[in-house]
Amino acid sequence: MTRGIVVKTKDKVKIAANYNKKGHKKVLIIAPGWCMTKDSKAFRQIARAFSSSYDTICLDFRGHGASGGFYTFSAKEEKDIEAVVDFAKKKNYDEICLMGFSLGAAASSIYASKYKVDKLVLVSAPYDFDKIENQMYKKEAWLETFRKFELIRFLTIRPSLFIHKKTKPADIIDKITCPTFFIAGKKDPTVHLWHTKELYNAAKCKKALKIYENGIHAEDLYLHHKKDFITSCLKWLNGDIN
């Protein structure tokens, strides 16, 4: 059963999320990237795909969807994850796992470097926000953006007009202690493959790396490789990948 929930961050921003409670003992928190929401078709599919094994909570970051505030491109979004994790803690799950996509992966890595989660999946995570390539002129970028475009979703996006100091995932990745699964596409035009490789090499936790040879960016890795993506992630989350 999926229901909408609203939690509040420590800086008083309301964060909306879809909570799919199936009675599992573990929960997977899903953190979309920039311009993606809990109600984006791709993320509804992702949450549904994992719900056979996990309760899921997919959030709207600040400045997205039904959440309040303005998006700060990973400067403050860890607070949004913190509020959702705190909600999950009250449900007494055996494990709280976190999966982030693109800038959602950046926020997830920052959160996990400070606070406890049981397992972490980072999909197309940037090494440094200022080094994101974002080559929108490439067919792999604009064509997929066009295919996923949802006007209702797009109209909810509210970026901050101010420049905020951002923590670089590169500077904190070695502080993550939970098992972490890095996933990337070799042909990613937005966050090039080297970002994930550098983060993986710098991580000191138990870790694994999966590269899709023909894969591109973030949720597109799921959309183009659905069965393998879900199977690989579940193997990692269940402790079956060393």
Identify the residue ranges that each predicted region occupies:
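N-terminal cap/lid segment of alpha/beta-hydrolase-fold proteins
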Residues: M1-K22
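The serine-hydrolase catalytic nucleophile loop
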Residues: W34-R48
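Conserved alpha/beta-hydrolase
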Residues: A47-G68
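Catalytic nucleophile-loop/oxyanion-hole region of alpha/beta-hydrolase
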Residues: H64-K91
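Catalytic histidine-centered segment of alpha/beta-hydrolase-like enzymes
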Residues: G69, G215-K227
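Hydrolase active-site cap/lid region
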Residues: Y115-F162
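Short beta-strand/loop motif that positions the catalytic acidic residue
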Residues: I176-T177, F182-A184, D188
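Conserved alpha/beta-hydrolase "acid-adjacent" motif
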Residues: P189-H195
